[in-house]
From Swiss-Prot:
Record's keyword terms, sorted: Disulfide bond, Signal
Similarity-based family: Belongs to the Ntn-hydrolase family.
Domain of life: Eukaryota
Cellular component, GO, one term: lysosome
A Pfam family it matches: Asparaginase_2
GO molecular function: N4-(beta-N-acetylglucosaminyl)-L-asparaginase activity
Gene3D superfamilies noted in UniProt: (Glycosyl)asparaginase
Leader sequence segment: 1-22
Protein name per UniProt: L-asparaginase-like protein GD25160
Keyword Hydrolase: no
InterPro entries (UniProt xref): Ntn_hydrolases_N, Peptidase_T2
Intrachain S-S bonds: C90-C95, C189-C205, C344-C371
Length: 397
């Protein structure tokens, strides 16, 4: 009887110990999951978080922004059509040195285009680069995303792809292009993108031959000035009330570039990037620097790691400046709730246009930010001008 009593007590103690361990494990798992959930809410918000529709474009072209915004307001899931509309509007108007100005040729006088579009939901990306003979490159980039398993097509093969889908081929170079090239040639081909060659590219047009390696001058200096109205790339970001992002970029390429050069507009993460779980970003500036550092991608990942948009924007620009002290350009960052910020370097100030948002629902406004090199200032919203006139819409297929 004594032995049976002892066994019964041991069994009860064993069951009690097992029960306590089970409760402890469940409690630990609960608190771990709670911490993970709290962190996710901090980073990404909850389903109940109100999202404000937003349309942002780089530089100060309000007409193109308003056309894109009007498309975004037409109905459900219009972010893709909105950013395409913005790119098309700038392509067919005079936005900086874009195609309408026909003043951004390569050193052989050719006008080639590049464009890209990214879906923040699927993370699919479509782009073309070095494409000649087709005006609306953004439509071809969108076709790469929709109809192929590739991400980027380049050169004459991109033109051939566009023709196969029915896009009209046209001769883009005209008298204005030839005049721009003639002036450049008469000025000793300045500026240009050669280095460490003979004769000196700072004084001569070439042809060039490589210098011996011991004569190379490794530091690269920024000679390609980017100012208001004197740039070749624009980017658009659209966010709808469901939290869906699309970003797009279109460019005629750096003026007097070496033929064959691919720019940041076609490189994922350099000029544009978006992820619906986190947010989106667009960048503009010295494309060769942007391609080396992928600032749009870095900005989104900085927000994923917990930074606010203003912190992410400034961090990215400061990182670029650490490696490229003469960099000029900017980044605009938007989180998944529509909160935006921008930072820049190397300019007096950077302009971008915003439509939508919580306080100013239907008016494009030019935002201005003083660049970090001079004022160490970051912008995070606020109206700077109202542009209520909406120009005639262009149809987006």
């Amino acid at each position: 009887m004594l032995a049976q009593s002892c066994c019964l007590r041991l069994l009860i103690l064993l069951l009690l110990f097992t029960s306590i361990c089970s409760v402890s494990k469940k409690s630990l798992k609960y608190f771990r999951n709670r911490k993970l959930r709290e962190r996710r809410i901090k980073l990404f918000g909850t389903k109940k978080t109100e999202i404000q529709s937003l349309l942002i474009s780089t530089w100060n072209y309000t007409d193109a922004n308003l056309q894109a915004w009007s498309v975004l307001q037409q109905g459900h899931r219009r972010t893709r059509q909105a950013v395409i509309q913005g790119c098309m509007a700038c392509q067919n108007q005079r936005c900086g040195r874009l195609l309408a100005g026909r003043s951004s040729p390569d050193t052989e006088g050719a006008l080639t285009l590049e464009a890209a579009i990214m879906d923040g939901e699927s993370l699919e990306y479509g782009a073309v680069a070095g494409m000649d003979g087709v005006r609306n490159a953004i439509l071809v980039a969108d076709a790469v995303l929709k109809y192929t398993k590739h991400s980027v097509l380049v050169g004459k093969s991109a033109t051939k792809f566009a023709r196969s889908l029915g896009y009209k081929e046209e001769y883009l170079t005209d008298a204005r292009t030839k005049n721009v090239l003639k002036k450049w040639s008469s000025n000793g081909c300045q500026p240009n993108f050669w280095r460490d060659v003979h004769p000196s590219p700072a004084e001569n047009c070439g042809p060039y031959s490589p210098l011996p390696e011991h004569l190379h001058q490794h530091p690269m200096h920024q000679e390609y000035a980017i100012t208001q109205g004197q740039h070749d790339q624009l980017a658009f970001l659209a966010l709808d009330a469901e939290g869906k992002f699309h970003v797009a970029s279109q460019s005629s390429g750096a003026q007097f570039r070496i033929p064959g050069r691919v720019g940041d507009s076609a490189v994922p993460g350099a000029g544009i990037y978006a992820d619906n779980e986190v947010g989106g970003a667009v960048a503009s500036g010295d494309g060769d620097v942007l391609m080396r550092h992928l600032p749009a991608f870095l900005a989104v990942e900085a927000m994923r790691a917990g930074k606010d948009p203003d912190q992410a924007a400034e961090w990215v620009v400061q990182r670029l400046l650490r490696h490229n002290t003469e960099f000029n350009g900017a980044v605009v960052v938007v989180n998944r709730r529509g909160i935006y910020a921008a930072a820049c370097a190397g300019l007096d100030e950077f302009h971008f246009v915003v439509s939508g948002g919580k306080e100013y629902l239907s008016m494009a406004r030019v935002e201005r930010v003083k660049c970090l090199e001079r004022e160490n200032e970051v912008i995070d919203g606020g109206p700077k001008g109202l542009f209520p006139t909406i120009p005639e819409k262009q149809k987006v297929p």
